[in-house]
Amino acid sequence: MTLDRTFPIFTVRWLAVHGLAVPTVFFLGSISAMQFIQR
């Protein structure tokens, strides 16, 4: 019962972390690339 309640929370947390981390890394990478191209 305990694992059944903890698993969905872990999944939502994992999805939220990756959903925010992936675009952030992509955004920072594109910004740094633009600055390198301008110079």
Curated annotation (Swiss-Prot):
Record note on cofactor: With its partner (PsbE) binds heme. PSII binds additional chlorophylls, carotenoids and specific lipids.
Lineage: Eukaryota, Viridiplantae, Streptophyta, Embryophyta, Tracheophyta
Subcellular location: Plastid, Chloroplast thylakoid membrane
InterPro entries the record matches: PSII_cyt_b559_bsu, PSII_cyt_b559_CS, PSII_cyt_b559_N
This protein's record includes keyword Hydrolase: no
Organism name: Pinus koraiensis (Korean pine)
Record keywords, A-Z: Chloroplast, Electron transport, Heme, Iron, Membrane, Metal-binding, Photosynthesis, Photosystem II, Plastid, Thylakoid, Transmembrane, Transmembrane helix, Transport
One Gene Ontology CC term in the entry: chloroplast thylakoid membrane
UniProt-recorded name of the protein: Cytochrome b559 subunit beta
Gene Ontology biological process terms in this record: photosynthetic electron transport chain
Chain residues that bind heme: H18
The protein's required cofactors: heme b
UniProt membrane topology term: Single-pass membrane protein
